[in-house]
């Protein structure tokens, strides 16, 4: 099932990587319903993996999954593979635009417009940590807290992620808030993530970051309150 390029380092490395691939697939099948694994199964069938030496890998991360070509480039012996395989597992390559998990990419002339990449990356980190004990990037702590709160409010968040269903998530959030508020919430997660990934948050960014964080947290509290209120009203009507 798993295809390795001619650039593999040696049989030992290849065997270790093969074990990681099997560990990933088994864990996903144990954890999630089969209906949520259609993209994983489709993409694993045609996945190509390139194991590279560090001097050949000109990229700030230790692994990278290409959504369009369904190729994974990774440094030898690195557990970042689990994060990237989660990206693979929710990559809808049949869509004319690239939809991967909660992230949407639209090509407009020479530019690529993205939306909800922050939510997608953070939730991928959360799942990689939960399922495979991958350490979460410490610079994204606050955004992780917000997305964990979101997960508590949206019970089927893992299923929406694996089925690349951002639309359904927005509709769910809009049941108790407005559509614009829901889209703003997702956009603000993007902004927070972008600031956090700078690693060195400049002094002038701190106030902006704090304001965006408070606004994003308020949205979640507002959603929870309005949902609880509506559910309580329904219960009272049944009495």
Show the residue positions of the predicted features.
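Post-HExxH zinc-binding segment in Zn-dependent metallohydrolases
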Residues: 102-152
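Pan-zinc metallopeptidase signature
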Residues: 137-239
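Auxiliary, metal-adjacent structural segments of Zn-dependent hydrolase domains
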Residues: 2-75, 95
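Active-site recognition of the HExxH zinc-binding catalytic motif
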Residues: 79-96, 121, 125, 129
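Hydrophobic (often cysteine-bearing) scaffold residues that line and stabilize catalytic clefts
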Residues: 13, 17-20, 78, 82, ...
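Generic alpha-helical structural element
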Residues: 13, 17, 74, 88, ...
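Non-Sec secretion/translocation targeting segments of pathogen effectors
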Residues: 2, 124, 237-239
């Amino acid at each position: 099932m798993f295809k390795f390029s001619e650039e593999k380092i040696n049989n030992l490395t290849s065997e270790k990587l093969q074990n990681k691939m099997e560990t990933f697939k088994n864990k996903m099948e144990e954890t999630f319903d089969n209906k949520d694994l259609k993209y994983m199964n489709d993409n694993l069938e045609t996945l190509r993996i390139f194991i590279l030496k560090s001097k050949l890998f000109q990229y700030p991360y230790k692994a990278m999954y290409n959504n369009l070509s369904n190729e994974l480039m990774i440094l030898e012996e690195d557990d970042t593979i689990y994060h990237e395989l989660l990206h693979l597992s929710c990559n809808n390559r049949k869509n004319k635009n690239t939809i991967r998990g909660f992230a949407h990419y639209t090509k407009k002339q020479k530019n690529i417009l993205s939306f909800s990449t922050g939510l997608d990356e953070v939730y991928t980190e959360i799942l990689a940590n939960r399922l495979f004990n991958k350490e979460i990037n410490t610079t994204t702590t606050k955004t992780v807290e917000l997305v964990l709160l979101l997960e508590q409010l949206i019970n089927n968040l893992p299923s929406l992620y694996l089925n690349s269903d951002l639309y359904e998530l927005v509709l769910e959030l809009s049941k108790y808030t407005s559509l614009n508020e829901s889209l703003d919430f997702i956009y603000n997660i993007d902004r927070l993530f972008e600031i956090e990934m700078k690693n060195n948050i400049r002094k002038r960014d701190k106030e902006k970051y704090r304001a965006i964080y408070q606004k994003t947290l308020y949205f979640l509290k507002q959603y929870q309150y309005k949902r609880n209120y509506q559910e309580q009203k329904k219960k009272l009507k049944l009495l």
